[in-house]
């Protein structure tokens, strides 16, 4: 079967060969399941890396190449007795038992462990002598350590069940393990809650069980195929494990929405009397084309994150682009095939009470609810534009107090063993054993000049309360030196970042002065700080890329420079309001208790840019669907006011339902334990809600009324632009009565 690359012809060809299309998608689904089972875990990583070379990466690369090999995870096990000191025989017996069990895991899990009774108590015993530490270096790289640390945690859990003492573990691997476990749990919870609420909303919007299940099925198919492709691509490029959350969240949101728009138009055309094939053609030529172009806008917005030289941004962008692409493809091929096969069976298992409500409250008819909204708003367009803009600008104001950073271990739930361990380590020791600052000297590291500079730096650091004990080592030929300094703060918090800035900008220059050596500062906090700086540096480029390409695409689609300009301004208003509300709730704590969120001092540093990319694309969805319906009517009547009212009333219920589905999906993820998911889900949900309510129902019709025919203004100098209108062909007027059931041609 030969298909044209035209989305309309693609859908038409799929509807005329439905079983072939369903068969192809079934094979892809099964293959994806196999790829997920065999390859996905190996395609994911708990670490983030840069694709350029900031200070922290340059230092880490030197250490890996010339001193210690691949970076390893350093853990700390803390044993604490309330009534015994480390020199008590009972304390030593318990300490040795735990040490020996950990050592017995073997070199495949534990690279090394230090016993205080062999190495001496210095740095391994608390000041009150009631707590003692077992420093552990995990075997393998950070990903292997995050997997193997579960065996150590099992030992700790078993020992912690005993009475009379407490035992804790913390460190990069333990923190990563807890984070990944919580992420997987939050993912399952978000999918369950979001999926169930989405099903209820679909039932309310569509009124039948079969039609409500179709969007869910296509969303699941899109998610599975995206995960399968991630597993395959991950053999050459490792993805952040958070990409699975991204794919599920975006897949449920756009997969359901895209199917809902096309399926609803199909049912509408069947109700007008078109045959099944004609209804598929019209739905694909109108709603299907809208799905394509709105999906392309989403992809363009997500592509902005690919500019940033960070693997986590590239991972999230790639995962989201994959699932959006499969959702578009499913809407243009699999859905038309299913609509052809189901025909009017898509309306089976009606829910009579919902149908009765829809019949009695048909808001899509002339004079219905949405018609009244449009009429009222367009009577006072200036008031509508000014009032909504003022509200959104006011909601944006808290954003100017934003403090970006990383949530850190301190924001983990209290039940997380890595948090308990970190707090105990911080209370009883310096706290920096597992995440020290590392100063790397690239030159003759054994020379008197370098040795003097190192001693001078140690003296400077001793005056800063954040920094603790320092140790210095060099490689065999003395070409690389490493000064490792403990930090007595949570390595993710702003206080730690400021300490690294002082180290880089003040302390190192003071100590090394004219010493002929390259000095780099690396370590967990330095990597985190560089990530923040890289994000800040590249944000303007991402904004320019997304806004510029979105403007061009919308200008081509609607053949207007006014429509894309307005759409961009409105989207920026909704994104700005979302930013402000995140700061208000998460950072300032307004309503946090009611929503079940944790108040923190910072908003995740990557969140504003991430939200901009995702929200800009998603917000365009509703603009594209609404404006395409308005343009479709305007081309027929030439009456701007009538076209706006028509567009609003024919998309009102649909867009409201679609938006509520997105809010439900994002809200499900916001109910997780991790602060980053709370902030992400809340920000996405509130922005979509704002966009689909006051912007779509008040700001869009008000501005359309004010500008009138100028909405569709295209300068004559641009008249050469190709016509790729989103409205498509409706195939002429529909017959008065519906034709036969499931077949049609």
Language-model-detected regions and their locations in the chain:
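Membrane-embedded transmembrane helical bundles of large multi-pass transporters/channels
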Residues: 1-43, 48, 108, 127, ...
């Amino acid at each position: 079967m030969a298909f044209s690359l035209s989305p309309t012809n693609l859908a038409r060809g799929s509807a005329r060969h439905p079983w072939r299309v369903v068969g192809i998608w079934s094979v892809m689904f099964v293959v994806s399941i196999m790829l997920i089972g065999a390859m996905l875990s190996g395609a994911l990583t708990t670490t983030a890396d840069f694709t350029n070379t900031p200070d922290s990466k340059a230092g880490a690369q030197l250490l890996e190449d010339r001193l210690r090999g691949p970076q390893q995870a350093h853990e700390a096990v803390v044993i604490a007795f309330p009534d015994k000191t480390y020199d008590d025989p009972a304390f030593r017996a318990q300490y040795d038992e735990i040490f020996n069990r950990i050592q017995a895991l073997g070199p495949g899990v534990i690279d090394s462990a230090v016993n205080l009774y062999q190495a001496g108590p210095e740095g391994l015993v608390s000041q009150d002598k009631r707590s003692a530490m077992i420093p552990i270096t995990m075997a393998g790289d950070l990903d292997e350590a995050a997997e193997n640390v579960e065996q150590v945690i099992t030992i700790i859990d078993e020992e912690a069940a005993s009475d009379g003492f407490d035992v804790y573990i913390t460190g990069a691997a333990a923190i990563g393990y807890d984070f990944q476990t919580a992420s997987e749990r939050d993912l399952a919870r978000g999918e369950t809650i979001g999926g169930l609420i989405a099903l209820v909303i679909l039932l309310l919007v569509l009124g039948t069980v079969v039609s409500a299940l179709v969007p869910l099925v296509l969303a699941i198919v899109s998610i599975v195929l995206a995960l399968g492709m991630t597993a395959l691509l991950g053999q050459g490029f490792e993805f952040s494990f958070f990409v699975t959350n991204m794919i599920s969240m975006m897949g449920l949101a756009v997969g359901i929405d895209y199917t809902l728009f096309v399926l609803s138009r199909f049912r509408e055309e069947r109700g007008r009397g078109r045959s099944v094939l004609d209804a598929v053609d019209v739905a694909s030529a109108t709603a299907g084309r809208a799905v394509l172009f709105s999906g392309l806008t989403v992809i363009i917005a997500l592509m902005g994150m690919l500019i940033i030289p960070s693997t986590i941004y590239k991972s999230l962008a790639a995962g989201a682009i994959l699932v959006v692409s499969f959702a578009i493809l499913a809407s243009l091929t699999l859905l038309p095939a299913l609509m052809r096969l189901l025909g009017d069976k898509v309306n089976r298992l009606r829910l009579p009470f919902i149908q009765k409500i829809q019949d009695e409250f048909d808001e899509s008819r002339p004079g219905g609810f949405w018609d009244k909204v449009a009429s009222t708003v367009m009577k006072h367009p200036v008031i509508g534009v000014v009032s909504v803009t003022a509200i959104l600008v006011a909601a944006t104001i808290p954003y100017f107090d934003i403090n970006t950073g990383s949530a850190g271990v301190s924001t983990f739930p209290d039940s997380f063993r890595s948090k308990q361990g970190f707090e105990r380590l911080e209370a009883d020791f310096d706290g920096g054993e597992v995440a020290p600052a590392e100063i790397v000297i690239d030159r003759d590291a054994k020379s008197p000049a370098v040795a003097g500079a190192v001693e001078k730096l140690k003296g400077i650091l001793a005056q800063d309360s954040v920094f603790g004990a320092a140790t210095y080592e060099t490689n065999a030929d003395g070409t690389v030196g490493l000064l490792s300094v403990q930090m007595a703060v949570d390595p993710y918090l702003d206080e730690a970042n400021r300490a690294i800035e002082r180290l880089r900008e003040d302390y190192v220059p003071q100590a090394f002065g004219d010493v002929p050596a390259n000095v780099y500062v690396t370590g967990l906090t330095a990597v985190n700080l560089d990530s923040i700086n890289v994000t800040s540096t590249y944000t303007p480029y991402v904004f320019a890329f997304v806004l510029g390409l979105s403007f061009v695409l919308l200008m081509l689609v609607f053949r207007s420079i006014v429509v894309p300009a307005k759409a961009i301004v409105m989207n920026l208003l909704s994104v700005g309001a979302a930013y402000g509300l995140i700061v208000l709730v998460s950072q300032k704590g307004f309503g946090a208790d009611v929503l079940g969120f944790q108040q923190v001092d910072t908003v995740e540093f990557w969140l504003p840019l991430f939200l901009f990319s995702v929200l800009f694309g998603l917000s365009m969805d509703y603009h594209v669907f609404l404006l395409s319906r308005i343009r479709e009517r305007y081309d027929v009547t030439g009456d701007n006011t009538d076209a706006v009212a028509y567009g609003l009333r024919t998309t009102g219920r649909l867009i409201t339902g679609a938006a509520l589905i997105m809010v439900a999906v994002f809200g499900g993820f916001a109910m997780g334990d991790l602060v980053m998911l709370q902030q992400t889900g809340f920000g996405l949900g509130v922005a979509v809600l704002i966009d689909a309510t006051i912007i779509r129902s008040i700001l869009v019709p008000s501005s359309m009324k004010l500008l009138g025919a100028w909405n569709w203004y295209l300068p004559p100098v641009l008249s050469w632009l190709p016509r790729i209108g989103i409205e498509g062909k409706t195939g002429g007027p529909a017959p008065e009565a519906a034709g036969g059931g499931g077949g049609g041609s």
